[in-house]
Amino acid sequence: MKKWLIALAGVLLTFTLAGCGSKTVASTSGGKITESQYYSSMKGTSSGKQVLQQMILNKVLEKDYGSKVSTKQVTKQYNTYKSQYGSSFSTVLSQNGLTTKTFKEQLRSNLLLKEAVKDKVKITDKALKKQWKSYEPKVTVQHILVAKSATADKVLDALKKDSSQANFTKLAKKYSTDTTTKNDGGKLSAFDNTNTSYSSKFLTAAFKLKNGEYTTSAVKTSNGYEIIRMIKNPGKGKMSDHTADLKKQIWDNDMSDSTVLQNVVSKVLKGGNVSIKDNDLKDILSSYLSTSSSSSSN
């Protein structure tokens, strides 16, 4: 299927298909290139067709779900990426042929598509139970990262005598090689089972800890040796207490599932009263409009 705005980079939405005519797009010593010539050339290419598909989908999504996606939401997601990439953010945008404006357009399109997924996909009890198996609530930990096993042993010996948060903080400042967190006692931002920043070994070890507990042996990861201490673990509790979180995680997974997205886009376009006026492009949505499928996470 075509990729519907689910990545940072993609086809830019600046190509305009409407209003093509005799206006000159470019001129050369060999003659002019008009909008109509440009349009005729582009509509026959895969990138040109992809842009039109995307524009059609965006129009329908805006009509159906535009009121559910605010500028504030787009800005919040934009700032998250900006913070993640730091000083290299502008370079990353440029390398992907994006500007602040076009990137925010993509983020908005992605949020609109997510609203469509939430609307069109039925989440079954079976799906909730399956997600519950891997679910872990957000926890807050502090950690000490060291390069050598001997150093880890030294830290663990000190913790055997005093495993308090104050002492762990002191040890983190002295030994940790994680320069971004050591001065704050190794404290990390809260995370749950959907976290992809830390290794599976790190996450597994962390989620096993109760408040005040620490890993009594170092966790070996690709970064070195990790010693983790739990600051706050609310406990998993009952599934019924976390239905909203479970649904959110399922929808997030659906956004990476091409089959689910295919079905959702098909439903959205079928309900969008789409009419293709150019005969050369009449079949551009055939793979979506000709299929009949049901969407459910089960």
UniProtKB/Swiss-Prot annotation:
It is a lipid-anchor. This is Foldase protein PrsA 1. Its EC number is 5.2.1.8. GO terms for biological process: protein folding. Residues 1-19 form the signal peptide. A lipid is attached at C20 (N-palmitoyl cysteine). It is an enzyme of class 5 (isomerase). Pfam families: Rotamase (PF00639). Belongs to the PrsA family.
